Amino acid sequence: MTEVYDFDQSSWYTKGSLAPILPTTYPDGRLIPQVRVIDPGLGDRKDECFMYIFLMGIIEDNDGLGPPIGRTFGSLPLGVGRTTARPEELLKEATLLDIMVRRTAGVKEQLVFYNNTPLHILTPWKKVLTSGSVFSANQVCNTVNLIPLDIAQRFRVVYMSITRLSDDGSYRIPRGVFEFRSRNALAFNILVTIRVEGDVDSSRGNLGMFKDYQATFMVHIGNFSRKKNQAYSADYCKLKIEKMGLVFALGGIGGTSLHIRCTGKMSKALNAQLGFKKILCYPLMEINEDLNRFLWRSECKIVRIQAVLQPSVPQDFRVYNDVIISDDQGLFKIL
């Protein structure tokens, strides 16, 4: 049985929207580089120099035989660094980077990025830029199938998204609780409905993910469980959620991210599941890759947030990442 409760609009009203990056061009048609700064926090951190940088641009030919042919739109998450440089200075150096791109494969298709340009202002992000980085292709590329293997490719930076980490305390992406299951527990999930502003056309993404310009995604917070395998009622869990005083915001971690801050009282068990952190970050890059790619430059805002209480999936249920077929003894079977 699933129970759904609505959060009050005041919990996301202040920071629940993202401004768009609208393409503008030079007279010759080239895109003009732009930077967007997002601050999803409350601004109570004394040192506001920590920021997350997300680069966006064109993956294009780098054979030097003529004007480069653009293959697809891509991104490069640089991660968190500390600097007092202005956003415009960071953008200028990013556009001068010579970032090579190579298509490869592991369990999934991947893209390899490495930079050949000496760093100055972007030195705090040297780990990703100078050591190279590998990402799942679906997370950082619109259409990986358009990237050739027989022609050298480079990533030309056009846009930069900066997320200021202005909340006091440490941020946490609660990966450890995503698959945590417990018998007779109630799973506490958050269902977010966002509205995309502007034109939603087939050239920018899959229209099937939108209904009336709206899309939803769900994140897992944790489980409510009692001792001796007894279950809480949904109404009791609702009271616990109300006491948490959750505040929501949209940020730019990995493209688009949901930030949740607990301003009230959290149960000891749930607090332990979350690593005793009260500032949570859920990048759509890890939750919904297709929706995240569509939102890289789009204007969007939260229109509804709901608490979803569902029975935790029993531990008896096996988690299958895929279906494997074995032909042992000449018979096909599903493992």
From Swiss-Prot:
GO terms for molecular function: structural constituent of virion. One of its GO terms (biological process) is virion assembly. Keywords: Viral envelope protein, Viral matrix protein, Virion. Gene3D superfamilies: Viral matrix protein, C-terminal domain (2.70.20.60), Viral matrix protein, N-terminal domain (2.70.20.50). It is found in: Virion. It comes from the Viruses. Disulfide bonds: none annotated. Pfam families: Matrix_Paramyxo_C (PF23765), Matrix_Paramyxo_N (PF00661). One of its GO terms (cellular component) is viral envelope. InterPro entries: Matrix_C (IPR042539), Matrix_N (IPR042540), Matrix_Paramyxo_C (IPR055413), Matrix_Paramyxo_N (IPR000982). Its main location: virion. Belongs to the morbillivirus/respirovirus/rubulavirus M protein family. The M protein has a crucial role in virus assembly and interacts with the RNP complex as well as with the viral membrane. This is Matrix protein. It comes from Canine distemper virus (strain Onderstepoort) (CDV). The gene is M.
